[in-house]
């Protein structure tokens, strides 16, 4: 356990992903939430007042953050002193705007860990699953040099939520000496993955939607970056694997399912 917890900020704290961040970080052994930020619509309110009518989780709003005043995500001057790490669940109107916002925090010396997809395909931004590719953090000095960032500032991202369970198994097979060359995956993704709008859409509750915009591209490309290698210019994608994906939205509140088939280089796994 750390002698002193790391003070953190949560961006997009009033949304579904942000609420999960707040819940997961409550009483965390490493992190202490001292700042929450969101859009202008929520800024200036106590966190409790901003989320009480739309709190998604079954557990109560953590007491430690209830009275924190929500900061506008663009109000950098109001970030409390001592904050060194930022967890971002913020999605702006365009991916380019989100990319700029994330690097603005990095430029100001903050380590920003993003849940958004805006920077997942940025070559010098690591997309890390700790059990698989912690060494991709080695690209951070390259990112800092490329973008003239201070020594404490960088952007790192997590991958798409629907791939996180099965990709760990695929990684274990690769490390055990097996060589998958083709992967076919069908995802059954919960309504919560579409945010508040997905949960409130009555039509979605009784239907299976056979297409989710952008999800198939993420599912097919993100694992190649995770299995990739660090080069002098950034992350070089793994090239010896072909992934084909079909992503569907199903009437389940929370929790994704994936049906995965693999073809291996050798006919036998013995």
Protein language model features and the residues they cover:
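N-terminal Rossmann-like NAD(P) cofactor-binding subdomain of oxidoreductases
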Residues: 1-210, 242, 266
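Charged docking surfaces used in two-component/phosphorelay signaling
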Residues: 179, 191-270
